[in-house]
Amino acid sequence: MLLGCNYSKELIELLQENIVDVDYIKLGLYDIYNEALEVSLSLRPVLLHGLGFNERATMKNIKDVDWKYVNDSIKNFKSPHYAVHLASCMQDWDKDVTEEKIIEYMSETTKAWIDNIEVPFLVENMPYSSIDIKEFGIMDICVKPHIIKKICDETKAHLLLDIAHAKVTARNSGEDIYSYLEQLPLDRVKEIHIVGTHEIEGIELRDYHLEMKEEDFEILQWVLSKCSPDIITLEYGGPGELYSWRSDKNVLKNQLIRLMNICRKY
């Protein structure tokens, strides 16, 4: 099994010092990251995550996507596959939209990606919390396991299983994390995202890309007993000031060494 990790200057330092090893560096294809992308590609293939089209399952600009640019970018950065968030946002719909219409549109968007890109296509499960609703307009329909399974089954899309997102959704929906995970199409998992979460006053859980706790490693091991992904990607760390307080070099090193050992077993 291969290992990926979010780009950060701390990751680059660890790689250059031969302290850790990863197979992929994850980063979005945005102009503000041009230098980081160049450095990353000089060291490892890049797991592209974001191409600048505001990609999501209910994106209304799907007809404007430049597929040549998409495929050229994937090829140039040696990304093995590409994923889009399986997100349905309130701002994408009229108030009277039906659940059936939303599901149909998400499936059509997924099929458009599958039909037009030259690598395997994945959909990523979303987190569901008050901040995801308030800031991003996330609708509960897109985090329901039977909907995720339906779209994967009908379109043959692979699943990018984000364990932190699943934890957030399960907790904030009053469901056990293992029960929630078991309902997802684990047979379709091609990549796993893993990172620590943040608890708000002992009630709500949020995805803040923090250090993994022991519970996170336990959930990962359980998931790996149920599926066989190609890649595990650690999402701790990132570029710039936004991630500076959660890109501790020693914390990153310790997590990666542990994940390297896990990957060697599979």
List where the protein language model places each region.
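A short secondary-structure junction signal
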Residues: 132-135, 163-164, 170-173, 204
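C-terminal helical cap(s) of enzyme catalytic domains, especially alpha/beta-barrels
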Residues: 243-266
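N-terminal ordered "arm"
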Residues: 2-36
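Active-site beta-loop-alpha junctions enriched in small/polar residues
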Residues: 6-10, 28-32, 51-55, 87-89, ...
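Acidic (Asp/Glu)-rich catalytic clusters
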Residues: 14-20, 33-50, 64-80, 111-118, ...
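Hydrophobic faces of well-ordered beta-strands that scaffold small-molecule active sites
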Residues: 1-7, 23-27, 44-50, 80-84, ...
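Gly/Pro-rich active-site loop or hairpin
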Residues: 56-63, 96-103, 169-230, 237, ...
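Active-site acidic/histidine proton-transfer and metal-coordination neighborhood
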Residues: 63-158, 168, 214, 250-251
